[in-house]
């Protein structure tokens, strides 16, 4: 199953026909510019560089920079990972004493420019990202269709805030399934899927296929290529211990969390799709809903309150003024649950999946997931678009952190 087939289960909010087309035919078709939080420029212990990369994964670029500069890659901070098949601009921090060495680094398709001194940049230290995207091979009436779709979605309050396919895997769409298996305590099933899932189009898929069919760990260690280092780590650990749980827990914590977060994201997407399907409004709070506060167009997901009969009109006015947004569940042991109709829908999904919120507490301690809330709608800021001859539709907009340009484009393109 590829991501298009996987995403076909999630309802579009727009009912109008899309423009079709393709993205990321060239890296320059997808430009991402990070907007950092201002506080990263406070302090003197770290040198802040603007990193421009083309066709590089963020982590791979960071490791290569560290290697060339002679520092540990863990000493380099960044606010978030950016698309690989794109041209991206983001800020990184390095120890101040390493500034000159980093300035001397020369890597193909990577540019580094010293900006100022500041503090260590942690994941999440950004406001959001600005995008410039070209969609090629679109329909002849793409501009008019885009205009109609954007108008329709503005009337409905915004774009559905689905987690993008990047959360689940573009070709091996299994991250969320692995997450569910981990929550069920099936570490062997999770490990076998992590090691063996394949679609036949990626390097190393023949080795994955052989393991999927035979379960032969010794053979897998011989056949798995070196770049599949996490898979090889897991295999070596299983060979040493004979225990799949201990083998899986040998993986770095951020890798294990990817799977739990992917499953959370799947359940959120499912909730959002069901709400659209059942005709429950996304931009009008219902009694029992949990809303998140919004300031300057940025949602603050840690500031929530419940909608009651008493405050319903007050909250509706807040939503109309874009000072609050209706939220959906990121299931976890400490998540604030909705009540009323929204709460029933949350309960229905948990029951279908055989889960309770406490299930997320029973994970090994570092992986236990408290959960939270996420706004149901996405409102691109400064959205502009136009048709460029011999290229296609060009889109420009800003999105808050944690949201996906591909989810905006999905409503316009209707390609999956």
Swiss-Prot record:
EC top class named in words: isomerase
Family matches, as Pfam families: TruD (PF01142)
Ranges of residues in domain TRUD: 158-379
EC number from the UniProt entry: 5.4.99.27
Keyword Isomerase: yes
Superkingdom to which the source organism belongs: Archaea
Active-site feature positions: 83 (nucleophile)
One MF annotation (Gene Ontology) recorded for this entry: tRNA pseudouridine(13) synthase activity
Catalytic activity: uridine(13) in tRNA = pseudouridine(13) in tRNA
GO biological process, one term: tRNA pseudouridine synthesis
Keyword terms: Isomerase, tRNA processing
InterPro entries assigned: PsdUridine_synth_cat_dom_sf, PsdUridine_synth_TruD, PsdUridine_synth_TruD_CS, PsdUridine_synth_TruD_insert, TruD_catalytic
Protein role: Could be responsible for synthesis of pseudouridine from uracil-13 in transfer RNAs.
Homology family: Belongs to the pseudouridine synthase TruD family.
Name of the protein described by the UniProt record: Probable tRNA pseudouridine synthase D
Source species of the chain: Thermococcus kodakarensis (strain ATCC BAA-918 / JCM 12380 / KOD1) (Pyrococcus kodakaraensis (strain KOD1))
């Amino acid at each position: 199953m590829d991501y298009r087939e996987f995403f076909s289960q999630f309802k579009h909010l727009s009912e109008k026909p899309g423009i079709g087309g393709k993205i990321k035919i060239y890296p320059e078709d997808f430009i991402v510019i990070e907007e950092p939080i201002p506080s990263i420029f406070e302090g003197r212990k770290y040198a802040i560089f603007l990193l421009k990369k083309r066709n590089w994964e963020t982590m791979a670029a960071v490791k290569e920079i560290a290697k060339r500069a002679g520092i540990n890659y863990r000493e380099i901070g960044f606010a978030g990972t950016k698309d690989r098949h794109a041209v991206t601009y983001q800020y990184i921090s390095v120890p101040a004493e390493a500034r000159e060495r980093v300035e001397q680094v020369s890597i193909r398709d990577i540019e580094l420019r010293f900006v100022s001194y500041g503090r260590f940049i942690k994941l999440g230290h950004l406001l959001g990202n600005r995008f410039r995207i070209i969609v090629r091979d679109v329909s002849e009436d793409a501009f008019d269709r885009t205009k109609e779709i954007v108008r329709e979605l503005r009337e409905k309050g915004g774009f559905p805030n689905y987690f993008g396919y990047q959360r689940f895997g573009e070709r091996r769409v299994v991250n969320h399934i692995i997450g569910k298996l981990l929550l069920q305590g099936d570490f062997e099933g999770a490990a076998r899927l992590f090691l063996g899932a394949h679609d036949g189009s990626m390097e190393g898929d023949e080795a994955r296929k052989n393991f999927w069919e035979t379960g032969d760990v010794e053979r897998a260690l011989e056949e798995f290529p070196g770049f599949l280092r996490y898979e090889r780590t897991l295999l070596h650990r299983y060979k040493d211990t004979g225990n799949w749980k201990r083998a899986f827990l040998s993986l770095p914590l951020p890798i294990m969390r990817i799977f739990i977060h992917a499953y959370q994201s799947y359940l959120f997407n499912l909730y959002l799709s069901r709400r659209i399907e059942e005709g429950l409004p996304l931009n009008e709070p219902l009694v029992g809903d949990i809303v998140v506060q919004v300031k300057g167009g940025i949602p603050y997901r840690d500031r929530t309150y419940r909608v009651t009969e008493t405050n319903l009109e007050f909250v509706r006015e807040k939503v109309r003024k874009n000072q609050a947004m209706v939220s959906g569940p990121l299931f976890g042991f400490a998540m604030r649950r909705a009540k009323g109709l929204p709460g029933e829908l949350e309960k229905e999904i948990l029951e279908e999946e055989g889960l309770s919120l406490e299930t997320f507490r029973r994970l090994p301690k570092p992986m236990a997931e408290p959960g939270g809330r996420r706004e149901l709608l996405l409102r691109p800021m400064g959205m502009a678009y136009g048709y460029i001859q011999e290229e296609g539709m060009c889109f420009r907009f800003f999105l808050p952190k944690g949201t996906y340009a591909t989810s905006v484009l999905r409503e316009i393109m209707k390609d999956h």
